[in-house]
């Protein structure tokens, strides 16, 4: 089942005790929040389209076959170019949707998190 977001959509493909696999699609020109996660790592495998990946202080162009490993608390973002961007995301660790700290967001979703939310 697809879950729609302002930037596109994702499908949950598989879930285990300490992992989660999603297929993610960003619509042309859209991007994720600049964000990090406190309790999980992510591995991205690009399968369609192209875009720009921000990882830490680096920006890298991506295309099908590109892979990225994002560490715990590492700032990251994906941005789609003109044809969109689709990739698989494999999360390892505590895989909860609310484990997202947004630093910048095009859709007005940045906010100060209550202390309890930060301790997920």
Where do the model's predicted regions map?
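Double-stranded beta-helix
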Residues: 1-5, 77, 81-120
